[in-house]
């Protein structure tokens, strides 16, 4: 149930009947103040101006043609030409009851699309660090949301599994007689990487062997491929442990690394040359883009093949877009990476489109995000200035949550306490990130994210358990509750009912824009509205049984909505806290 969408369609139709053209937009928005209705149509004045009409007179014509008697109990013209829409309580009760009986809380499946979501993307032979957190959890929340909306989601973990570093690693493993790479742990690989790089820089014979191994690896040499595959497998097994701890849905089956596209690169570059898009410059192949200018004001050159024959990230990203359209048959491809890659992605996709590899109908979307900062406003690091490993961050989250929960509640069993600590600790880290607009930088603050006050995971998880506790105090059969009539008389009941029915608006926005913070804001508002409802409208002590059952229905849908919303964010809930 998307109230905004329904009202938009109906008001737009009335505007067209009143004389506006087909391209008009009703601009339906949720009202900020009750006296201005539940929703407002803000597009009347622009349409009236186009027609050369008085906005209020045109607004009246729109009302005369509006078919809203079932949804709205009152429509009024306000100010210079706004239309205030007051929803019908009878319609609200019908829709609330329908949402309660629907498996997806009343959210209907949209026109199904195949959507590729490229997220997380760590590097092979290195441990995940805090820099991977945002892409991993934001991308996963959007993937969950799009699946919930009925789309076919293909997760693409675009891992860095190709390049000269593998020649170094294979050569050094051989030097140290560590052919049994499968027995190694990732921490060993990180140390190996440092030593391999040192040897590569200081020992020309070693460097030559490493370069030879790169060539052999790229040409399919069985020994090199076997060693490379072991390095990839060890890395992804370790990364899977992080994904599981984060309650992220990525698996090893979702790995679509750079190596997947490697066989495509020579033919793509050759085709770009044939089309006249790629031209030679100092031995390299370059595509010049008029849409981007260099510091001299000339078209910017984007290298797609180096003079030594090597390919670049741009070439790989062109291949990835082509593959996702041609092979995966996707309608949309979303890439979650930081803002610093924005120009790179724009250029790669511009070349992709100029070459005709994807049609205009194929949506390529860079969902960029800002940086995670420390309290000093600088990139989040260890005290000594080093990179923070993701596993260490999650360990600290559990340690801090353990202290917090032990202080708050000693009435939980050990198993219950363990579940709460994990849900709160990991949930706090994720929610602190997801609740911020992804395009902005944000400050990582343990105290804020673990607070039981404000827009935090602990507050949301506690709000859920409070509602669960209401139902733990009653033995009402769920079937009987669903069959009971719902009445909406009190203003607090009405406000809660409307907010519950706005769930789909938030979810659709996340699916369209890739902005989980919109869902976080919605859930936080819902929890606050329920708290106000709970204080002013007795539930278990209601004046009669019918009101009690009616309010329990509102409480039940709130519980279900909070749980579903947090699940879409990848945040666990618990029954007791």
Curated annotation (Swiss-Prot):
Family according to the record: Belongs to the class-I aminoacyl-tRNA synthetase family.
Molecular function GO terms recorded: arginine-tRNA ligase activity; ATP binding
Primary localisation category: cytoplasm
Motif ('HIGH' region): 122-132
Reaction(s) catalysed by this chain's protein: tRNA(Arg) + L-arginine + ATP = L-arginyl-tRNA(Arg) + AMP + diphosphate
EC number: 6.1.1.19
Biological process terms in GO annotation: arginyl-tRNA aminoacylation
GO cellular component terms, A-Z: cytoplasm
Alphabetized PANTHER family for the sequence: ARGININE--TRNA LIGASE, CYTOPLASMIC (PTHR11956:SF5), ARGINYL-TRNA SYNTHETASE (PTHR11956)
Subunit structure of this chain's protein: Monomer.
Keywords: Aminoacyl-tRNA synthetase, ATP-binding, Cytoplasm, Ligase, Nucleotide-binding, Protein biosynthesis
Gene: argS
Record protein name field: Arginine--tRNA ligase
First-tier enzyme category under EC: ligase
Localization (cell): Cytoplasm
InterPro entries registered for this protein in UniProt: aa-tRNA-synth_I_CS (IPR001412), Arg-tRNA-ligase (IPR001278), Arg-tRNA-synth_N (IPR005148), Arg-tRNA-synth_N_sf (IPR036695), ArgRS_core (IPR035684), DALR_anticod-bd (IPR008909), Rossmann-like_a/b/a_fold (IPR014729), tRNAsynth_Ia_anticodon-bd (IPR009080)
A family per Pfam: DALR_1
Protein's organism: Haemophilus influenzae (strain PittGG)
């Amino acid at each position: 149930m998307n109230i905004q969408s329904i009202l938009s369609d109906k008001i737009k139709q009335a505007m067209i009947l009143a004389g506006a053209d087909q391209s008009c937009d009703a601009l339906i928005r949720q009202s900020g103040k009750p006296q201005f209705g539940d929703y407002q149509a803000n597009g009347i004045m622009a349409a009236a101006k186009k027609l050369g009409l008085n906005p209020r007179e045109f607004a009246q014509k729109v009302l005369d043609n509006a078919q809203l008697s079932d949804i709205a109990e009152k429509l009024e013209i306000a100010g210079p030409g706004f239309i205030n829409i007051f929803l019908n309580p009878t319609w609200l009760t019908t829709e609330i009851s329908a949402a309660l009986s629907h498996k997806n809380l009343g959210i209907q499946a949209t026109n199904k699309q195949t959507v590729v979501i490229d997220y997380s993307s760590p590097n092979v032979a290195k441990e995940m660090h805090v820099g991977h957190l945002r892409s991993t959890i934001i991308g996963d929340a959007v993937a969950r949301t799009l699946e919930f909306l009925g789309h076919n989601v293909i997760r693409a973990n675009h891992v860095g599994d190709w390049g000269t570093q593998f020649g170094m690693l294979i050569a050094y493993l051989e030097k140290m007689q560590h052919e049994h790479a499968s027995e190694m742990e990732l921490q060993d690989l990180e140390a190996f990487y440092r030593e391999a790089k040192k040897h590569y820089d200081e020992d020309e014979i070693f460097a030559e062997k490493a370069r030879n191994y790169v060539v052999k690896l790229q040409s399919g040499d069985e020994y090199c491929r076997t060693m490379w595959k072991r390095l990839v497998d060890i890395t992804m097994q370790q990364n899977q442990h992080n994904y599981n701890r984060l309650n992220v849905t990525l698996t090893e089956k979702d790995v679509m690394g750079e190596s997947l596209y490697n066989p495509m690169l020579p033919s793509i570059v050759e085709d770009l040359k044939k089309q006249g898009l790629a031209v030679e410059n100092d031995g390299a192949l370059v595509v010049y883009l008029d849409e981007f200018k260099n510091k001299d004001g000339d078209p910017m050159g984007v290298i797609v093949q180096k003079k030594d024959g090597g390919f670049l990230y741009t070439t790989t990203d062109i291949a990835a877009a082509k593959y996702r359209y041609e092979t995966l048959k996707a309608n949309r491809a979303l890439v979650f990476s930081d803002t610093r890659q924005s120009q790179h992605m724009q250029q790669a996709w511009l070349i992709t489109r100029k070459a005709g590899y994807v049609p205009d109908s194929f949506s390529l979307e860079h969902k960029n995000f800002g940086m995670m900062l420390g309290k000093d406003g600088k990139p989040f690091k260890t005290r000594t200035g080093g990179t923070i490993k993701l596993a260490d961050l999650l360990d600290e989250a559990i340690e801090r949550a353990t202290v917090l929960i032990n202080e708050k509640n000693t009435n939980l069993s050990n198993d219950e306490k363990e579940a709460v600590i994990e849900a709160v600790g990991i949930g706090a880290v994720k929610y602190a990130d997801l609740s911020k607009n992804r395009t902005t930088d944000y400050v990582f603050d343990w105290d804020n994210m673990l607070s039981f006050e404000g827009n935090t995971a602990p507050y949301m998880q506690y709000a859920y358990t409070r509602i669960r506790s209401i139902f733990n105090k009653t033995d009402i059969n769920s079937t009987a509750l669903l069959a009971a009539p719902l009445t909406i008389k009190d203003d607090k009941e009405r406000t809660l009912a409307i907010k519950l029915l706005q769930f789909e608006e938030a979810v659709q926005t996340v699916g369209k824009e890739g902005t989980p913070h919109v869902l976080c804001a919605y859930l936080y508002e819902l929890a606050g509205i329920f708290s106000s409802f709970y204080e002013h409208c007795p539930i278990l002590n209601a004046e009669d049984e019918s009101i009690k059952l009616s309010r329990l229905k509102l409480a039940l849908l709130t519980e279900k909505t909070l749980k579903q919303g947090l699940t879409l964010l990848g945040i666990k809930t618990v029954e007791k806290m």
